[in-house]
Amino acid sequence: MIKVKTESIQKMLNKAVKVCSLDKFSPLTILTEVKIEGGYLSITTTDTRTTFQIKEKVETTDEMRVVVDVQLLTSLVNKITTPKIGFDMNGNALVIEGNGLYYLDIGIDESGEVIKFPEIKEPAGNGTEIDFKELTRRLEIAKSSIPASFDAKEMNNYYLAAQIIASDAFKVSSVPNIESLKAKELFISRELGNILMSLGIEKGKLDYVSETNTLTIFDNDYIIQSVIGQDRENYPLEAIQSMLSSSFTYNADISKKELLDILDRALLFIKDFDRNGINLTFKKDRLSIASVEETVQEDIKYSKASVDGLVEFNALVDIKNLKEQLDVLPDDNITIFFGDNDRAIKMVQKDIIQITALLED
């Protein structure tokens, strides 16, 4: 019986399970590999495109490798209250000793062997030091423009270069990349982005092999390896960059909090047949917000504006899209650019750009 600290394996499993897509049509995604070898306990999970492994030193010379149901193991381990948990094998079962004895079926392939997980290859180089806490903060802002559906596969990605860009048919987000990644060009899936955001990684290294599109993120106790770049050839980067550089005639500064408060109230009056539409009417000294049927009307005064020659400019936008893009902005003051552009309005906060498309009347 191999003994492991309960708290340690709880933390490891609670991280590892976040990588699983739990797709019943893809068996590996509902399983985890638990391996004890060379004095280390390692736990591995995958969504088939991204594989994650976390390890910790343990005081044993015994070795073991099993593959079991990840949700069952995680739920069980989280409910065990003994200081240590024991692991052993009995035929095709993993025996766990905690408050009692528990038997979990071991995953076996057609040849009768324990199921194999994707091999994680050692990074090709030393990697680039990355501040993942700051990177994920910026990804969370860009996430506000990731499509709600998975239909347009190429759009369900983040483009990372000098800027982190995300877009769907109605929204674009552009956030400056962290300095250590600005010279690289990466195209990562929304799933990998979600994994990085959910794991709460603060530091580590990044290695990218362009020939195989293999991205490896690693530190002393974990490694994430993913194949990236799928659908890059279909990604409309030039069109998105053109939208980001679009010119507008006017701009005005307003309070994000005031605008969000109004939108929260206005949302109560939005009906299904309104297509989530909300009218933003830019006037010389204020922004007027009204529902399509004008059952709600409120104004915000500009704190600063450049509106010479403006009479009035009306923009019908999706209220939910607008709220999502505003919610993630870190500060209160925003500059909205509008006018002489029948496609969109642009919201800027320092070096963050959020673009919301106009709806047809």
Q: Where do the language-model regions lie?
A:
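Structural preference for solvent-exposed beta-strand-turn elements
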Residues: M1-D361
